[in-house]
């Protein structure tokens, strides 16, 4: 489980300055990240290291990350906002 300092740091790293990313990443880190297992938390931190334009394309479904870990995290975030 994430400690409060880590959550605050991730919150600020999730605020990208691009509204489309902010509305996906900030609620995810606030509501979902604390309950993720250690592997998925690491995947989310890895996602935050990516370029904004790459993430924008993935979240707008214009492409997928080549990395399987990133692909899993993108799908998890999209599934949260696009229910069946």
Curated annotation (Swiss-Prot):
- For this chain's UniProt record, which GO biological process terms are given? succinate metabolic process
Summary of the function given for this chain in its UniProt record: An FAD assembly protein, which accelerates covalent attachment of the cofactor into other proteins. Plays an essential role in the assembly of succinate dehydrogenase (SDH, respiratory complex II), an enzyme complex that is a component of both the tricarboxylic acid cycle and the electron transport chain, and which couples the oxidation of succinate to fumarate with the reduction of ubiquinone (coenzyme Q) to ubiquinol. Required for flavinylation (covalent attachment of FAD) of the flavoprotein subunit SdhA of SDH and other flavinylated proteins as well.
PANTHER family referenced in this protein's UniProt entry, alphabetically: FAD ASSEMBLY FACTOR SDHE
Source taxonomy:
Bacteria, Pseudomonadati, Pseudomonadota, Gammaproteobacteria, Pseudomonadales
Chief place where the protein resides: cytoplasm
Instruction: Report the sequence similarity comment from the record.
Output: Belongs to the SdhE FAD assembly factor family.
What keywords would UniProt list here?
Chaperone, Cytoplasm
Q: Which organism is it from?
A: Pseudomonas aeruginosa (strain ATCC 15692 / DSM 22644 / CIP 104116 / JCM 14847 / LMG 12228 / 1C / PRS 101 / PAO1)
Superkingdom, taxonomy of origin: Bacteria
- Localization per Swiss-Prot or TrEMBL: Cytoplasm
Instruction: Give the Pfam families listed for this entry.
Output: Sdh5
Q: Name one GO cellular component term.
A: cytoplasm
The gene is sdhE
Q: What is this protein called?
A: FAD assembly factor SdhE
């Amino acid at each position: 489980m994430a400690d409060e300092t880590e959550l605050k740091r991730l919150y600020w790293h999730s605020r990208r300055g691009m509204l489309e990313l902010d509305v996906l990443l900030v609620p995810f880190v606030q509501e979902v990240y604390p309950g993720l297992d250690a592997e998925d938390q690491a995947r989310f931190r890895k996602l935050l290291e990516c370029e904004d334009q790459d993430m924008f394309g993935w979240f707008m479904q214009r492409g997928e990350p080549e990395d399987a870990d990133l692909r899993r995290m993108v799908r998890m975030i999209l599934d949260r906002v696009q229910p069946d």
